[in-house]
């Protein structure tokens, strides 16, 4: 994955609120000699219930917390409410992200570039129906959201109440890569962000409101997640055609290796893989995201030419 050095980045929708212990984070750099770069955000999380009403988080963080850490979901729904953007004290983490060249050199700036690409892709795809995600917010430790107070244990997630994607970029080194054996590579984080943006698209289209069953191999929760995987595949196919605000291409290269990394990341967070690794057996009745094979397959449906109708997992007889 490489970005067009001439592309201009828009940082207005990407914010960092720093560490819960205080202080911002430095601008991380990609390893030298790696055009595809390094990133450690391999887990696509899920959707958090908004407004303090829904007490269940439909996220892979649910499995991570309950099965790896022995706790709850990591989301305190009691403090839900609308997002007060003024409460964020932004660090300057993304201030130096100005061009595609910066994105080729910095994990942080690559994150901005991917957000810009998702914004452009879904704007073109949805047309007048499009409403952009309010923000991509990175944090460390804990953060207040429109869906409640969330800890790093939740993993990346989308909050419909404030139209915002949240992620702790350090969480995935520890959990997915080290504990679940997930892949490491530049396009892994891009896949994660695309999957979370897919949840925003579902919110825009009203699909999130169709979720009635929370667990099970054919549950609405699984269908929601697989559809977001399919949307991520759609974006990946069209990413090299996305542009900055002046019409300059954002990406200069997206390779087969990048797609392989996305598929590997999708498989590593399949419910069956997580359950087998964390509890030694598979329980389909408790699935919320789908199997490794399903996650890969639905990503491919989107990537191999699928459109919104092809990604309608709620209409699929077989997942």
Where are these regions (language model features)?
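Long amphipathic alpha-helical segments used for membrane anchoring, targeting, substrate engagement
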Residues: 1-95
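Acidic helix-start/capping segments at beta-turn-to-alpha-helix junctions
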Residues: 97-120, 127-149, 249-255
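Short helix/loop segments within enzyme catalytic domains
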Residues: 109-115, 119, 125-127, 227-272
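Active-site recognition of the HExxH zinc-binding catalytic motif
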Residues: 122, 167, 191-204, 225-229, ...
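Catalytic zinc-binding patch centered on the HExxH motif and its immediate surroundings
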Residues: 142-168
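Short pre-active-site segment immediately N-terminal to the catalytic Zn-binding motif
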Residues: 173-191, 216-222
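Post-HEXXH active-site segment of zinc metalloproteases
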Residues: 203-226
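Pan-zinc metallopeptidase signature
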Residues: 272-319
